[in-house]
Amino acid sequence: MRNKLLFLLCAFLACFGSAKADIWINSVYFPDSGFRTWVQKHFDKPNGTKLTDEELASVKEIISWKENFSNVENLVGIQYFTELETLRLYNNRYAFQSLVMYLDLSKNKKLKKFTFTANDYFNPYSSASHGNQASRISVSAPDYPYLRSVNLKDLPNLETVVIDEHILSELDLRGCPNLKTVEVTNGHNSISTIKFDKCLHLETLNLNNCFDYNYNYMDWSLMPNLKHLNVDDNHFESLDFSSLQNLESLSCHFNHITSLNISNCRKLKSLICSGTDIKTLDCSMNDSLISVDFSECKKLEEFPKLPKGIKSITCQYVPLLATADLSLYPNLTELNAAYCDLKTFDASKCRNLVALNLNYNFISALDLSCLKQLNIKKTFISQKLNLGATRIPNQIGLWRLELPEIVDLDKIFSYDYISDLKRFNYTLYAEYYTDDNGTRHPSFVTNFLYSGSNSTNIIFSYSYQTNLFYEKDGKQTELLMDAWVAAKQVPSGVEDLAAEKTVKGVVYYDLQGHESAVPFSGFNIEVTQFTDGTSQSKKIIK
């Protein structure tokens, strides 16, 4: 009998110990008035009433912008929603009236997905919702709605963590073995510590603009199955990804790295390492690589070694492209080579190009006739030329701008000054001239030239035929390359009457471009012309 009573007592205590505490809608359990109001609306219960176990367990998902959060500043009480699987927060004081900056989710053991983003702008006008940037007003620094602290430790079911716009000083993700995606971005380089356990399921890791200046190491071996990695805009000085044999995409641009080890990343398909200090880049062993971007790698000592199967190369601001043999890459379909200081481009070495960007090189003539697959909408070939100008003997005020020998003047479709004022008043024509050795050279002749600090200003442009035709409005149209020309005087040994600079004449223009020898009433542009071909303009009001 005594043993039976003891058994019943133990059973009673066990039942009592496992019973859930009563949860009430009040300031004790939900101290934030905004969150408490949401609880009342969600369960359709007034303040001061009790929540049943079934009601608490029914909360599987909270999405702040769908749930009409209002004036919510903390989520104390969220731990009572033990079946919560998804929490998505959007901090915006002015749009959704939410400003949660400190968060403890360590008791929500069923949580699978946590996402947080913040917007440090508010939209005072309805037009803002339609993308009107003028109506987006920046919030002052103390009001930035960035996440400052979050506890996600020991959440065995957690699979996705996305945190954008934060000033976290640390992030502890230990005890989260089922992580698949972690994106902690736009942290204003605030994080000094980030901790992981072995994450065998982690496939995507994005730590863009995350770490402070003292953080320079990450143990990549903890995530051996990682496929997609982004560590852009941090302060890493060296990166060794030899343990990431399953990596498929890597972006590490604008770090301070001088070397990059990806030799074991045989599955790598996409690499972005632009804006780094690397001196060499060897991708010859990465046979799966199809896209690479090493733009603005200004310390490269040689053109990178790339696999034969590469399809896309982006190398803006890399003059070493001029030394590369693009015929080594027969599968190349996209080339982005703007600002590479190229003077020529041999399209016959990459006949399969579909997209081509050669903007703002120094190419004076271009033949694209062999690029039969080129998409005109993905083709950008505007150039800027800096030519030397020499005085033409016995021609007062005329300057010769010699063009590179590859220019065929018959291929120049059109040319003109870029300013109406110059167009009305100055001479410009193209001609071949013969030097003292009997050699013909292409050139432009002008009687206008900027002087002094303005010598690099654009004077005129010309359009050059590229021998590539495409269909437009049912007709075959030739693609033209626009070249913008600046010129600077170079010594020629020629001494003529123009050596003494005197005023040749003065003309006036009104706002409509009308010319007169005397000023118009009101606003004028006064242009003084000199005998050496230069001019000076100023605004006057009569």
Regions found by a protein language model. Name each.
Residues 78, 210, 296-297, 434, ...:
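Hydrophobic alpha-helical segments, especially N-terminal targeting/anchoring helices
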Residues 488-515:
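Residue-level detector of functionally pivotal "anchor" positions at catalytic/ligand-binding pockets or at interdomain
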Residues 510-532:
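Short, surface-exposed loop/turn motifs with a glycine/proline- and acidic-biased composition
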